[in-house]
């Protein structure tokens, strides 16, 4: 049982990936790789691990299930989300749903209530059923389907990384180590910015960073809404990009925008 506990997602794994960024950049520089590898690095950071893996897959599909997709796309979502280094869908969804229920309180797992140091994942509050009781059908569904990944997450991650390394050291470096580390830092900063002032807010970043979910207040007002652009001039890049996966959206959670000012 103790060995199994080490294989499960934990804050140590994610923090280690975060802190590896200087090493990754140094190794990238001394590798004398062409600019194409650095372009690939930025692509994996912004599109693969952030926009697809976190925003679309882990956040909107696995956690809130705002839509349904085909089986091959589900596996793609599982891989892109897991390779970001932030755990499996079960741990992610549980933490996020607790965040929604106890937002900006001492029981919130992350954000300004945990202090600026929570930009590092090791300072997130550990989700405990005793402190933050949460019974959700979605978590039960995810546990039945992806319990194996929750139990053997570290093995899954190491095997995937090993395959990358075996194909080409630069694939490991520019398609995982550097971009995954950038992603974890970006996510750590995002959860602080989204609740700066101890309240959910829409941030200026939603217009200038397409890979960033900046309409966070809108999301908290309607967590099941597939499109969080409620007002004139707003655009939900994650929703727009997710349409390439031919999803079947559940529009029951979408508010009547005519009543929103």
Language-model features: locations:
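Non-catalytic, topology-defining segments of multipass membrane proteins
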Residues: 1-187, 225-261
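Glycine/small-residue-rich hydrophobic helix-like segments
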Residues: 189-236
């Amino acid at each position: 049982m103790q060995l199994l506990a080490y294989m499960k997602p934990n804050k140590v794994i994610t923090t280690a990936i975060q802190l590896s960024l200087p090493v990754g950049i140094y190794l990238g520089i001394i590798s004398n790789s062409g600019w194409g590898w650095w372009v690939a690095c930025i692509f994996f950071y912004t599109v693969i691990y952030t926009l697809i893996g976190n925003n679309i897959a882990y956040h909107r599909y696995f956690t809130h299930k705002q839509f349904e997709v085909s089986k091959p796309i589900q596996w793609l979502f599982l891989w892109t989300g897991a390779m970001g280094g932030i755990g499996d869908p079960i741990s992610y969804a549980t933490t996020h749903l607790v965040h929604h229920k106890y937002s900006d309180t001492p029981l919130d797992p992350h954000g300004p209530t945990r202090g600026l140091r929570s930009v590092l994942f090791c300072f997130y509050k550990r989700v405990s059923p005793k402190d933050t009781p949460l019974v959700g059908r979605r978590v039960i569904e995810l546990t039945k389907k992806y319990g194996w990944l929750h139990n053997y997450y570290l093995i899954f991650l190491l095997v995937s990384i090993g395959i990358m390394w075996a194909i080409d050291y630069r694939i490991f470096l520019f398609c995982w180590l550097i971009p995954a580390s950038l992603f974890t830092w970006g996510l750590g900063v995002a959860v602080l910015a989204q609740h700066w002032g101890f309240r959910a807010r829409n941030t200026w970043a939603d217009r200038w960073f397409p890979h960033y979910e900046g309409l966070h207040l809108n999301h908290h007002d309607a967590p099941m809404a597939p499109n969080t652009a409620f007002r004139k001039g707003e655009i939900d890049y994650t929703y727009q990009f997710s349409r390439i996966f031919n999803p079947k959206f559940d529009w029951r959670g979408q508010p009547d925008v005519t009543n929103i000012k």
